[in-house]
A protein has these predicted regions:
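A short, proline-enriched helix->beta-strand linker immediately N-terminal to the Walker B motif
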Residues: 166-170
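Catalytic Walker B motif of ABC-type/P-loop ATPase nucleotide-binding domains
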Residues: 172-175
Length: 256
C-alpha cells in the first residue's frame, strides 16, 4: 500500500486554475522529485498536500486513511487539519526560522510545546537530546547555540530540515530548498537531502536541480501549467522523456 495517495486534486485562485486533476501515489521509503518551470504548480501542490492551502477538489490519504476529501466536510475541520499536518514535515524555500531562538530551540520548540499541551509523556531532556542528535546529523554540532542571523543560508536551511525531522513526520516535503541559497551553499543542503534519501526517508522535493533529481529521486513528476505532463522513474523521465513538453523543458538545462 502506498504511504501517500493523491487523487484528482484541483485548486483555483479566484478564476485561475492552478492545479488541474493531479493524481499520484508514493511508496514508503521513496523520494519523489517534482520538477517544472516557476509557476507550474509545484509549490501550490506541496502546500495543498500539507493543508496550508485547501484544495477545491480531490482526496489525500496517508497509509490508507483519508485525511482530506473535498466532498466530505468532516475531513475539513480546522482543529483536525492541524493534527493531520503532523503527518508531514515542511522545509520552505526561505528557511522560516524563528529569529529570536537558537538553532537548537528552533528544532525542539514544537516538540516541547506538544509535550506540554498534548501531554505526550516526553521529557524535555529526551526532546533536547534528539534535537542535538539531529543537528549533529546536519553537521551543525558547533552551531546549536547560534541564532539564525549568525548562520549562513546553508546552515539555516539545515536547521530547518532538522526542525522538520524533529516532529517525526511520515513524509518530508521540501519546497525548492536551495532556491534561496548562493550557488556555493547549495551543495551542502543537497548533500544532507541525499543522505536522507540513502536512509530511505520518504520525501517529496520540489526542485530545479535536475542532476540531483535524476540521481537521488526514485520517481519524478514533471508539471507544466498545473497539470502532470509526465511521471515515472527518475532516470527514465530525465534521460528519456516521452512527452515533447518534457523534452523541451529538460533541453534548457542540458544547454546550461
Amino acid at each position: 500500500m502506498a504511504i501517500l495517495d493523491v487523487q484528482h486534486i484541483e485548486k483555483h485562485f479566484g478564476d485561475t486554475p492552478v492545479l488541474k486533476d493531479i493524481s499520484f501515489s508514493l511508496e514508503e521509503g521513496q523520494a519523489l522529485s517534482i520538477i517544472g518551470s516557476s509557476g507550474s504548480g509545484k509549490t501550490t501542490l506541496l502546500r495543498c498536500m500539507n493543508f496550508l492551502e485547501t484544495p477545491d477538489n480531490g482526496v489525500i490519504s496517508v497509509r490508507g486513511e483519508t485525511l482530506f476529501d473535498a466532498n466530505d466536510p468532516d475531513t475539513k475541520r480546522e482543529a483536525d487539519i492541524r493534527k493531520k499536518r503532523l503527518h508531514f514535515g515542511m522545509v520552505f524555500q526561505s528557511f522560516n526560522l524563528f529569529p529570536q531562538y537558537t538553532a537548537l530551540e528552533n528544532v525542539t520548540l514544537a516538540r516541547q510545546l506538544m509535550a506540554k499541551t498534548e501531554k505526550t509523556g516526553e521529557s524535555m531532556e529526551s526532546i533536547l537530546a534528539e534535537g542535538k542528535a539531529l543537528l549533529e546529523r546536519m553537521g551543525l554540532a558547533d552551531r546549536m547555540e547560534n541564532y539564525p542571523h549568525q548562520l549562513s543560508g546553508g546552515q539555516q536551511q539545515r536547521v530547518a530540515i532538522a526542525r522538520a525531522l524533529a516532529m517525526k513526520p511520515d513524509i518530508l516535503y521540501c519546497d525548492e530548498p536551495t532556491s534561496a541559497l548562493d550557488p556555493e551553499l547549495t551543495g551542502e543542503v543537497l548533500k544532507v537531502i541525499r543522505g536522507l534519501a540513502l536512509q530511505h526517508t520518504t520525501m517529496i522535493i520540489g526542485t530545479h536541480e535536475m542532476a540531483f533529481a535524476r540521481d537521488v529521486a526514485d520517481q519524478v513528476i514533471f508539471m507544466d501549467g498545473g497539470v502532470i505532463v509526465e511521471q515515472g522513474p527518475a532516470r527514465d523521465v530525465i534521460d528519456n522523456p516521452q512527452q515533447e513538453r518534457t523534452r523541451h523543458f529538460l533541453s534548457r538545462y542540458s544547454q546550461q
